[in-house]
UniProtKB/Swiss-Prot annotation:
It comes from the Bacteria. Involved in the degradation and assimilation of the plastic poly(ethylene terephthalate) (PET), which allows I.sakaiensis to use PET as its major energy and carbon source for growth. Likely acts synergistically with PETase to depolymerize PET. Catalyzes the hydrolysis of mono(2-hydroxyethyl) terephthalate (MHET) into its two environmentally benign monomers, terephthalate and ethylene glycol. It catalyses: 4-[(2-hydroxyethoxy)carbonyl]benzoate + H2O = terephthalate + ethylene glycol + H(+). Residues 24-44 are annotated as: Disordered. This is Mono(2-hydroxyethyl) terephthalate hydrolase. It is an enzyme of class 3 (hydrolase). Its main location: membrane. Residues 26-44 have a biased composition (Pro residues). It is a lipid-anchor. One of its GO terms (cellular component) is cell outer membrane.
Length: 603
């Protein structure tokens, strides 16, 4: 039974922010489907005074880091549900900063945090992951991802978030590529890589114990993209901090992914039409929306039925990687070759386009042919058409919007490219933002990749050391009962889903029986964290809690399409399956209904 704290007056807040190359399948112990979460244990009565006592100068709160300053400790009223957010309970909000200092670049730095503790607490602690290169403190209502309206706070978890140790509004240097300029300061790099999450977790747990009179029973972390990397990092560096972790689309070796960004830019350049103001090929003009959709349809024509059902989803993504080649594929609309035999038309791709996309998708190599990052998956989510609207999720990273007169793809001139130069290259390479696309075009794949392994002066850790989360030694996390769910969209253009699958296979080889504590769910058609022609909506928190607290491993996770118009239907649900299984049609019933599919080995 929950204990309601009737003396609390609390204020509203809004919600903020194919398999891999290995061959070691992981056995999947069979479990019963997850049940509803058990009622939380009773918590001690708290009060307005207990909340306000967390403010500096009140009470005798001892923080794990003495350099902790509380700036807000206030009651917040319950907030009603809206179209985009679940109702929030009354709660105590505490926000502050840890380790205020001045960096070697002359800019001020601090590790900001925001904590929310509900009046009716379920005894659980929750941290939400960041995004991009962080630098923004979210509302900290505990986003659980998967397109969910519910948040951890709405489910009565105590929730916390951090900005990662720098502030995009403060640490914005236009001469050092803007908001990624924190990379000029060595400590800010370490804070963003791992230190801030350790510091904020400790602070949050201490405040929770003080406020409620006892420690949390279990602790959970959910993040996607950079937040997914943070989750993997926590399981490796700080295995005792969290009992359950969800790591979505993890940029666990993001510095390498940045190298891939330069590779895709240079690979696509020969197909570009026109130049930008700096004389750089307009990568966004290399494929029109219709061209990219034609490629997506050709992938479906080759791969859709490889799972036993032609339904607009490539479930057998492993077989697809071996089967599809744009140079030999057909346009399913007319049965003619996808690659133009003569002049370019609306029904085919030019030989230059085909060569460009094949080179880009194969992944970067140096002059000796050594891979520098992973390959990318051929998947229908590279485009998609809902009504008359083309999916932009994939192209926004590699190409940018077709109608733009400037290069605006994340990997060409956006934060993905900029962060590599200032945050991950050592020493950092500050420059005006107008020069980024040209720098990507001049990237040397023999020399520049060495910079993610380099140290220099006060930069005593390489970016792969402070930011990478590549370890497969999760013994400490496993041995204390930790559980981790990884997920990744097959059409993610930020980080390769095949790279995450390769990590999972390495984990299985290093730790036999890894499926007993870690499982990977690949999502066909989904783009980066969400979107695309796939079932991109799901709740990972409920099955995670069931696994951690009741030992019920997730043998499948229910998912549904956020944009069923991609399939020309009103709704579509499917099971997400633990790698290496895929969703297979049972042979009868509505193909848009999850119950008519089962998780099984690919055909």
């Amino acid at each position: 039974m929950q204990t309601t704290v009737t003396t609390m007056l609390l204020a509203s807040v809004a919600l903020a922010a194919c398999a891999g190359g290995g061959s070691t399948p992981l056995p999947l112990p069979q479990q019963q489907p997850p049940q509803q979460e058990p009622p939380p244990p009773p918590v001690p009565l708290a009060s307005r005074a207990a909340c306000e006592a967390l403010k500096d100068g009140n009470g005798d709160m001892v923080w794990p880091n003495a350099a902790t300053v509380v700036e807000v400790a206030a009651w917040r009223d319950a907030a009603p549900a809206t179209a985009s957010a679940a109702a929030l309970p009354e709660h105590c909000e505490v926000s502050g900063a840890i380790a205020k200092r001045t960096g070697i670049d002359g800019y001020p730095y601090e590790i900001k945090f925001r904590l929310r503790m509900p009046a009716e607490w379920n005894g659980r602690f929750f941290m939400e992951g960041g995004s991009g290169t962080n630098g923004s403190l979210s509302a900290a209502t505990g986003s659980i991802g998967g397109g969910q309206i519910a948040s951890a706070l709405s489910r009565n978890f105590a929730t916390i978030a951090t900005d990662g140790g720098h502030d995009n509004a403060v640490n914005d240097n236009p001469d050092a590529l803007g908001t990624v300029a924190f990379g000029l300061d060595p400590q800010a790099r370490l804070d963003m890589g791992y230190n801030s999450y350790d510091q904020v977790t400790q602070a949050g747990k201490a405040a929770v114990a003080r406020f409620y009179g006892r420690a949390a029973d279990k602790s959970y972390f959910i993040g996607c993209s950079e937040g997914g990397r943070e989750g993997m990092m926590l399981s490796q560096r700080f295995p005792s901090h969290y009992d359950g972790i969800v790591a979505g689309a993890p940029g666990y070796q993001l510095p390498k992914a940045g190298i891939s960004g330069a590779w895709t830019t240079q690979s696509l350049a020969p197909a570009a039409v026109g130049l930008d103001a700096q004389g750089v090929p307009l990568i966004n003009k290399s494929f029109s929306d219709a061209d990219l959709h034609l490629l997506s349809q050709a992938i479906l024509g080759t791969c859709d039925a490889l799972d036993g059902l032609a339904d607009g989803i490539v479930d057998n993504y492993r077989a697809c990687q071996a089967a599809f080649d744009p140079a030999t594929a057909a346009n399913p609309a007319n049965g003619q070759a996808l690659q133009c035999v003569g002049a370019k038309t609306a029904d085919c791709l030019s030989p230059v386009q085909v060569t460009a996309i094949k080179r880009a998708m194969a992944g970067p190599v140096n002059s000796a042919g050594t891979p520098l990052y992973n390959r990318w998956a051929w998947d229908a989510g590279m485009s998609g058409l809902s009504g008359t609207t083309y999916n932009q999720g994939w192209r926004s990273w590699w190409l940018g919007s077709f109608n733009s007169s400037a290069n605006n793809a994340q990997r060409v001139s956006g934060f993905s490219a900029r962060s590599w130069l200032v945050d991950f290259a050592t020493p950092p390479e500050p420059m005006p933002m107008t020069q980024v696309a040209a720098r990507m075009m001049k990237f040397d794949f023999d020399i520049d990749p060495l910079k993610i392994w380099a140290t220099s002066g006060q930069f005593t850790q390489s970016s792969m050391d402070w930011h990478g989360a590549t370890s497969t030694d999760l013994a400490a996390f496993r041995d204390r009962g930790g559980k981790m769910i990884l997920y990744h969209g097959m059409s993610d253009a930020a980080f390769s889903a095949l790279d995450t699958a390769d990590y999972y296979e390495r984990l299985g080889a290093a730790m036999p029986g890894a499926a007993g504590f870690a499982r990977l769910f690949l999502v066909p058609g989904m783009n980066h964290c969400s979107g695309g022609p796939g079932t991109d909506r799901f709740d990972m928190l409920t099955p995670l809690v069931a696994w951690v607290e009741r030992g019920e491993a997730p043998d499948q996770i229910s998912a549904w399409s956020g944009t069923p118009g991609y399939f020309g239907v009103a709704a579509r649900t499917r099971p997400l399956c633990p790698y290496p299984q895929i969703a297979r049609y049972k042979g009868s019933g509505d193909i848009n209904t999850e119950a008519n599919f089962a998780c099984a080995a690919p055909p």
